[in-house]
């Protein structure tokens, strides 16, 4: 019981299994689930990238995203620019993405997180703006602590309703992050520009 209490206090995941379950089978199953989840995340990321670069295909994309997102709900895009990120190799980019994504575990709605056009992109679906701002604030502080030598800029787009409008939130986030980079602000909300 002491171990369970300690793990709960530290927010450390504890896996308990019955004795008859073989650890090798459990690890294999868990690994397969992780691989499948990563593949699904990559496909969703590609769909959002397509939506941003080819908005005329939004109806086709809408059909493909229906299983994972409420396409009639609200969408909001956040762009995260990190100083000199254009010089990151794939391993460094993956390491930074992992650090950023640790902060998103509290998001209880559908979201996508990926690298696109020089920025880390977070697309959230049906998430209250106050909760998003709290998560972004936590992520910013954590990133500054983990990477003190790099300046981080955030651009937060407007919350839009329906998948058709996600491109507008993306463009507004891009304008906001561009302003943040230009004036050396850590964070700019499009609505406050």
Q: Which role does the model predict for each range below?
A:
Residues 1-18:
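Extracellular/luminal Protease-associated
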Residues 2, 25, 165-168:
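An acidic, carboxylate-rich microenvironment
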Residues 6-8, 31-35, 171:
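Short, hinge-like loop/turn segments at secondary-structure boundaries
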Residues 13-14, 33, 84:
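Charged, low-complexity surface segments at secondary-structure and domain boundaries
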Residues 18-19, 192:
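Proline- and acidic/polar-enriched loop/turn elements at helix boundaries
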Residues 19-20, 159:
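An acidic- and aromatic-residue-enriched active-site/binding cleft used to recognize and process polar
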Residues 23-56:
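Juxtadomain coupling helices with adjacent low-complexity linkers
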Residues 44-193:
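Hydrophobic helix-rich structural segments at or within alpha/beta enzyme and signaling domains
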């Amino acid at each position: 019981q002491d171990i369970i209490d300690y793990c709960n206090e530290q927010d450390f995941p504890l896996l308990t299994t019955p004795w008859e379950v073989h650890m090798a089978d459990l690890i294999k199953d868990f690994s397969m689930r992780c691989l499948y989840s990563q593949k699904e995340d990559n496909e969703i990321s590609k769909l959002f990238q397509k939506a941003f670069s080819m908005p005329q295909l939004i109806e086709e994309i809408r059909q493909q995203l229906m299983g994972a997102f409420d396409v009639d709900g609200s969408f909001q895009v956040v762009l995260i620019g990190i100083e000199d990120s254009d010089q990151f190799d794939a391993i460094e980019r993956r390491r930074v993405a992992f650090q950023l994504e640790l902060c998103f575990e509290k998001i209880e709605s559908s979201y996508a997180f990926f690298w696109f056009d020089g920025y880390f992109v977070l697309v959230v679906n049906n998430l209250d703006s106050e909760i998003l701002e709290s998560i972004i604030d936590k992520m910013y502080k954590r990133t500054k602590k983990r990477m003190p030598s790099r300046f981080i800029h955030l651009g937060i787009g407007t919350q839009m309703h329906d998948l058709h409008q996600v491109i507008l939130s993306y463009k507004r986030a891009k304008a906001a992050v561009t302003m943040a980079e230009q004036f050396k602000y850590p964070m700019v909300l499009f609505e406050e520009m």
